[in-house]
Structure formats: C-alpha cells, structure tokens
Amino acid sequence: MMNTTFAPPFWLKNPHIQTILPKFLVKDTLDYERHLYKDSLDESDVAFDYLLADDVLVDGKYQKPLVVLFHGMEGSSQSHYARTLAKQVQTAGFHFVVPHFRSCGGVAVSGKIFYNAGDTAELHHYLGILKQQYQTIYAMGVSLGGNALAKYMGEYGTDAICECAVVVSAPVDLASASIAMDRLLGKKIYTPYLLNPIIKKALDNQITADEITALKRAKCMGDFDNIFTAPRHGFVSKNDYYRQASALPYLKEIVKPTLIITAKDDPFLGVTAERGDVSSQVVLLTTEHGGHIGFIDYDYATRAFCMDYIPKRALAFFEGCV
C-alpha cells in the first residue's frame, strides 16, 4: 500500500463536498461517436461511445492503445469522471471508449436482465468486441464498474483481455457498502439520487404486479437489490448477490497489473482492500481525502479547480504497464 500527496485545501477536505461538487464543475461537452452492439445474452442493445485518436490499421487493428472506462451505477460517457478521463486520454494520443451497461447511456433494455456489480461475463464480452479492432487495451472502472473490473481481473486471470486495470472508489465488499449507504447522509442524499432513476427504469421493464408494488415501497439500495437485482440475475437474495458479486475475494487471484485507488473518507464504502487481501500484482493507492470519485484540488495560482488527480495517475499506470 502506498500513500499519496493528494492534499486538497482545508475547505475541500469534506468527503461530501468531494463527492458532490465534481458534477457541477465539469462543463466540457464531448462529441462521442456511438456504436450499438448486442449484450452478452444477445438480448439488449448496449451503447459504446468512442473518442478516436489519429491512428492507422495494421492487420485490421489500431496500433495506439485504447482506454476503456466502465462507469458507475447509472453513470454514462457524460459523467464527470468520464469527461475528465477522456480529456487526459486525448492528450496522451490514445483512443477512448465508454461501453455502457444494459439500460444506461439512454439505450433502453430489451430483455429482463439489467446490470449488476459482478457481471464479469458482460465485461469480457465488451472487451472481446473491442479486441477485434484494438491491439492494446487498458481498462479503468469506477464505483460499481470498478468492483466489476476488479472481480473480472481476478476471476479471469491470464484470460483477462485488457493488459492492466485501474479501479477507483470501488465497493469491493458490497454488503458493507450497502450498510454505509444507509447512514444518514447516504440515505437522505445519495440513495435518492441513485435509486429513483433505476427504479423508474425497472418499472418500465417487464415486471409483475407484485414487483411493481414492492419497488414503489423500496427505500434504499438494499431494498432494490432484494426485490429486483438479486432475483433478476439469478441470486437467492440481496445477501447472496453481495457475496457472489463482491470483488474482494478475487483480488488475490489477479495476475495482471492492477491499481486500486481508494479514499479513506469515501462515504459510499465499507470494508476496503488491505495488503493481505490482494496479489503481488495489485498496487493499493490510498488517500486520506477524496470522497467518492471526487479527488478535487484547487490551484490558487490559476484560481481554478483541478480534476486531473485520477486521470493522471491512471495514465501513468497504463504507460508503465507497456
């Protein structure tokens, strides 16, 4: 485990400011090129949003690296972390893509299966699509997408398609993360922000009258996972889902370079990975502050907020994996 020099000014150290403020700071719009593919079940369309670099094809594959971002719950290519990473990737001259999970990115789900935090088969399917056109693939996952990517790296081992991975603000122990989200601010602020959109999607899907009644009564993510996520994805209960989908038990099996970045004050997380939980191929980067996918600093010289802490470390890690 290594500590870093991330040291925001005192007025930016609050974890909730770090978590909430980025949404309002990132103003840049990006002109993505969208392609639709079928999911791993061949049921629903999923959207891949690309930003392409100048490159040439050799034997049908682009030669510059592709950075793949797996988004968080209800995230998209327009999420603040996607846009800040995209800018850094463009500066490096690499390709960039956000493959959206089922029902995300404005593309409605067609089948009964949505997305969940442990669906590594879906990640493998997405990366397989991309590997057909790109020689070198680096992957980054944030929050829910970070847990899925970390689990993928351990579960697939040498068969993981990406060369290396960066995992940010990931709830690698889903049960304790669910408890953390039930704390006062989580229940009052974060839960409604995440829960309401996904319940609306579920209500628009193929559901029974009993499911409709239960979903309308859901008050927290645990309720939603028990009513919808677990049964839809073949789990007995939310606890069974959390146990099987959590990345933590798989971290010792990782054989490709993986960087896990976590803030100690992340309000979304419970149990986090320690050195004894991971393989020798995993680097743990832990900061005192940063909140959940925040890591905002401030430059007094330019009087501007700085959002590049995570993107710069991710790119440096990727380039070091070559």
PLM segments and residue spans:
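Short beta-strand element of the alpha/beta-hydrolase
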Residues: Q63-G72
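Catalytic active-site module of serine/aspartate enzymes centered on a nucleophile-bearing elbow/loop
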Residues: G290-V322
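Short beta-strand/loop motif that positions the catalytic acidic residue
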Residues: I254, I260-T262
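Alpha/beta-hydrolase-fold enzymes
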Residues: Q133, Y138-H233
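Active-site nucleophile elbow and catalytic-triad environment of alpha/beta-hydrolase enzymes
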Residues: I227-Y250
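Catalytic nucleophile-loop/oxyanion-hole region of alpha/beta-hydrolase
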Residues: A86-Q88, R102-Y138, A304
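Short amphipathic alpha-helix adjacent to the substrate-entry channel of hydrolases
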Residues: H80-V98
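N-terminal cap/lid segment of alpha/beta-hydrolase-fold proteins
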Residues: W11-G60, F305
